[in-house]
Regions:
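Short, positively charged and aromatic/hydrophobic N-terminal segments
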Residues: 8, 16-17
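Short beta-strand segments
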Residues: 63-96, 103, 111-115, 124
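Short, surface-exposed beta-strand-loop junctions and turns on beta-sheet-rich folds
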Residues: 98-101, 181-183
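Structural motif
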Residues: 89-90, 108, 131, 172
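Cationic, low-complexity basic patches in intrinsically disordered or flexible, solvent-exposed regions
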Residues: 11
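Short, basic/aromatic recognition patches
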Residues: 45-65
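Charged, gly/pro-rich active-site loop segments
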Residues: 19-47, 123-196
Length: 196
């Protein structure tokens, strides 16, 4: 049963007192909520791995913006960014920002790409877990991605501040697509990178 709100955390950041309150749940309720999808997945029909990856490829190729979450032990950041899906990785050109504070310590990330106009029962989204590799400025890999994005190298070299390039390598992608049900599959499917 839910109890009344109580302060969970108070901290001062930049002179502002922050108070986070929590609806009290029991450990059992947290476990029940946490395991919802894994319990449901046990009985759902799975898509063939190649068919699932094909859907992922098409979905990522047809979208341009993701929400990138980076974190350390005591810092989190979620940033909307433009990306390109190219050669099995997500590529992000970025001027910088606080996401690098977390990336300096922790190269593990989460990202979400989703339909913004989804109706109830018509969801389509990806939750991505992976790692980030900062790409060396003006390396061959950097040049290849700039060419793919049709960004002139001369323009990138003339910038006052560098345009950094992040390479996100997906390790696991959770797909949610209500349309999978029409073909007899579960609406939630999970793709995992095979390690050799």
């Amino acid at each position: 049963m839910y109890q009344t709100k109580r302060p969970l955390l108070q901290s001062k950041r930049e002179g502002i007192l922050l108070t986070i309150e929590e609806e009290k749940m029991t450990d059992e309720q947290y476990t029940q909520a946490e395991s919802f999808w894994t319990r449901k997945d046990e009985t759902e029909k799975k898509l063939d791995a190649d068919a699932l990856y094909s859907w992922i490829d098409e979905f990522l190729s047809s979208h341009k913006v993701l929400a990138l979450a980076t974190a350390t032990k005591d810092f989190i950041r979620c940033t909307p960014l433009e990306y390109s899906w190219y050669n099995g990785a997500l590529w992000i050109f970025t001027e910088g920002g606080l996401k690098f504070k977390a990336l300096k310590e922790n190269k593990h990330i989460a990202a979400a790409v989703f339909e913004t106009s989804a109706s109830f029962g018509g969801l389509r989204s990806l939750q991505i877990e992976g790692t980030v590799e900062p790409v060396e400025l003006f390396s061959d890999e950097y040049k290849n991605v700039a060419e793919f994005r049709k960004i002139p190298m001369e323009a990138l070299k003339k910038l006052k501040e560098p345009m950094w390039l992040l390479k996100i390598i997906p390790i696991e992608i959770t797909c949610l697509n209500s349309d999978f049900k029409k073909d007899g599959f579960g609406s939630r499917q999970i793709w995992k990178r095979c390690h050799s």
